[in-house]
A protein has these predicted regions:
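P-loop NTPase motor domains
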Residues: 1-220
């Protein structure tokens, strides 16, 4: 995270194997982008924003080609659904995308979340979009968008061969710690799965974690 242009790329979407993984990703993102000690007076906005994000992630996971399954595309979809005029009742390009999905697969899990998000008035929907955009605003940066567009880490291989993975966090900037939190969570999940379901209970190569300031810098 110190020099993103020199880093190996990491795309969390690559490690989504089932619906539970999608839920865990969204939950972890919201948790890790919430300042420590803060408490929302009205959880409605975060809950609704998470439903919108779940709809978008599920859509990409099941409907988009692999090269479009990333946070950069999430930002494109969010912009495509932006409500500029609360009096304009015409469907947005994002609405039309989900309308097409409803025609072909009305029971799609992405639609279930999109319907839940879309049940409010235009003013409410606009506020929900703003809430989600605020959570994801770092992905507007070209450096972070590029870092997370593809994946070069191959996390399960850490338990199969000798390799060292360094996650370097700036000492004076916690802006991108949320991505490291997601990385840790997905790494644990991948290694647990590989040990339990592929290698008979233990990894071929033991994995050791040296995590300085882990409790202070990340949330799982």
């Amino acid at each position: 995270m110190i020099s993103m242009e020199k880093s190996h790329c990491y795309n969390p979407f690559v490690y989504l194997q089932n619906d539970n993984d999608v839920q865990k990703l969204v939950t972890n993102l919201f948790k890790s982008t919430t300042p420590k000690g803060s408490q929302s007076q009205d959880p409605f906005w975060d809950t609704s924003a998470s439903m919108l994000l779940l709809a978008l992630v599920f859509y990409l996971h099941y409907e988009a080609p692999e090269d479009e399954q990333n946070f950069a595309m999430i930002m494109e979809m969010l912009r495509a659904g932006a409500i500029e005029d609360e009096e304009d009742t015409r469907p947005s390009p994002l609405d039309e995308l989900f309308a097409e999905l409803e025609m072909s697969n009305p029971d799609h899990i992405a639609l279930k979340y999109y319907r839940s998000y879309h049940s409010g008035a235009a003013k409410t929907l606009k506020s929900i979009q703003i809430t989600l955009a605020a959570r994801l605003e770092k992905f507007n940066l070209e450096s972070l968008a590029s870092l997370t567009t593809t994946d070069e880490l191959d996390l399960p291989s850490l338990g199969e061969k000798k390799v060292a993975l360094f996650a370097l966090i700036p000492d004076n900037d916690s802006s991108f710690n949320f991505l490291v939190s997601i990385l840790y969570t997905q790494l644990f999940q991948q290694l647990f799965y590989a040990a339990d379901h592929i290698h008979g209970g233990s990894l071929p190569v033991p994995v050791h974690f040296l995590m300085d300031e882990f409790a202070n810098e990340t949330q799982l």
